[in-house]
Regions:
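Multi-pass membrane proteins that catalyze or facilitate reactions on polyprenyl-/lipid-phosphate substrates
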Residues: 1-286
Length: 286
């Protein structure tokens, strides 16, 4: 019976991950609230790894949806050479820019991962960052602007590096990786659609690396998977994959006609809720 409920909780976690990883509303903020209600029977070490590795399902959704835009090779059926691969240089250049944008967060993330988890993974920090970034979205969208970059192929290395610098801030729980990079893209002159799509692509190496790091640390620390834990992880990843496809389609349709202001107000409201739950547990129920 415990396994059944753990799998059910994994489904809920997968839904939360699939929605909040791509919408700029902070997956961590929602996970903290979910953890107050969804109590797994697994170890704390497994759950720390589970919260991150479940992102693999979300990453796969981006790869599947945008494979043609991301695959840097084309196939030419030549008579003499047979099946020959040729580089699609516009796509390869996009990957170079993605790598440039990922470097700042990759370097600092590797160096500070444990320290950040120990000092910043708490309800107060998450609530403050939810509210701060919510205000930032509202203020940015109120500023009159004309996007100078509307296509991924027009993104410069300077813009990629600046977006990467903003992504560093996403190491702080509650900021939202997609929220940070979208804000960075908007401030660099990208359109909402361009900033959102670039954010999706940045997630592939960043989230794959973060998931791999957590998995290695779990195994290196003596962690051993039980059958129930493997099942929960697979279920969570599959659900995150399916829901991510729906969330990405929704966001790309949404930004064609709307601003990010609604997400800003939602973040502020969620931050207040997280702060309220923390205050209740700390001062009333303690």
């Amino acid at each position: 019976m415990d396994l059944f409920f753990d799998l059910l909780r994994s489904v809920i976690y997968g839904v939360i991950e699939g929605i909040t990883e791509w919408l700029p509303i902070s997956s961590t903020g929602h996970m903290i609230l979910a953890e107050q209600v969804l109590k797994f029977s697994f170890s704390a070490e497994f759950m720390e790894m589970f919260r991150v590795v479940i992102q693999l399902g979300a990453i796969l959704a981006v790869v599947v949806m945008y494979f043609k835009k991301l695959w840097p090779f084309c196939v030419d059926n030549g008579r003499d050479s047979g099946l020959a691969k040729h580089v699609r240089w516009p796509v390869m250049r996009l990957w170079f820019k993605i790598i440039v944008a990922c470097l700042p967060a990759a370097v600092l993330g590797l160096a500070l991962d444990d320290w950040i988890d120990a000092h910043f993974y708490n309800s107060v920090v998450v609530a403050v960052m939810l509210i701060a970034y919510g205000i930032a979205f509202i203020l940015i969208e109120r500023r009159p602007r004309v996007p100078t970059t509307t296509k991924l192929s027009r993104i410069t290395y300077r813009q990629a590096l600046l977006v990467g610098a903003w992504q560093v801030l996403a190491l702080i729980p509650g900021t939202s990786r997609s929220g940070s990079t979208i804000i960075g893209g908007l401030l660099c002159g990208m359109s909402r659609a361009c900033a959102s799509q670039f954010t999706f692509f940045l997630a592939i190496p960043v989230m794959a690396g973060a998931s791999g790091l957590k998995l290695v640390k779990f195994l290196a620390g003596g962690g051993v998977f039980t059958v129930g834990e493997i099942g929960a992880l697979l279920v969570g990843c599959i659900v995150a994959f399916v829901v991510s496809i729906l969330a990405i389609r929704f966001l790309m349709d949404y930004v064609k006609k709307h601003t990010f202001t609604a997400f800003g107000w939602y973040r502020i409201a969620l931050g207040i809720v997280v702060l309220g739950v923390w205050a209740l547990q700390t001062f009333v129920l303690a």
